[in-house]
């Protein structure tokens, strides 16, 4: 059902501009521009302003606009899911409830990393920008030593979001962000990995926020102004049902008051089709934007794999090349063994620490000889050192005393050679 809503226009120029915005809405889809025109033309308590809001709500619910909103939402979900994946990899914990806190935490973390790893003048300037960064502003500089290829695109995205209420984000841009977030220079290997993940997470959080504002920002402003008119017209707002029926009730009020709205002004009547409640539409958009991730989306899986490869999440530490060491021991383990690192178990070890430069390992021959020794000593209960005996109170009473019951490595080797 359509109802003609009267909108009183002050001047002919304003009437022309309003008609142009209405007629071209299907092409520009700039809800914020229409809302700004209404706010600049009418007082917020004017009935004509309420009528203009209802006309705008009707335009938003056209089929073409709904399809465009759905496309933006699907892309925003993909961007948010990738940002959350990076955040989980960095902090090894569940991501915060909102994207703003993720952006802030990652920005502070990257600033600390730049200051600690490099600390040059360029890094310190970048640190200042990161410490003051806000997700609603322009994208901060992330890499102090080089300009990424996608930075100019992000600047265009910001301008489009501010001027046109549109965020042109493509999958190619997401790939460029993943592949271009590299840090070189004086960074360690682990610092490079973390800095890359932080840069990707910050950028994706920023993009998601801009896309979210495109979808819900203007709608929230419209609904807040509609609730102000509900108070003016004494329309009850005591339940969720009242919020869902607010559009229809305002439409009836404006229809009743239309006879004396014009006065000396030019009154233009616009037909409005009562469609989906703005409250329901806004709630549905918000649920979609903050809903579950998209793990089965092939684009998500492909981009996640690119993040893993770009940040080197699953690259192995180079193997130890020291002569005589097993190939599966890392360089760090090899260095720690070469200095005779003690047992890392809890508590004091009662055994003498092996500091022999030979670093001999117990071979299969040694184990066979040990079995022979245990079999030989099993006939003497007083010297038995089985597992049950070691766990007895006698052996656990005093480490200094019990250490006398164990053989040193040299004594063990001499015992074997005598066999």
Curated annotation (Swiss-Prot):
It comes from Alcelaphine herpesvirus 1 (strain C500) (AlHV-1). InterPro entries: Herpesvirus_BRRF2-like. It holds the Pfam family DUF832. This is Uncharacterized gene 48 protein.
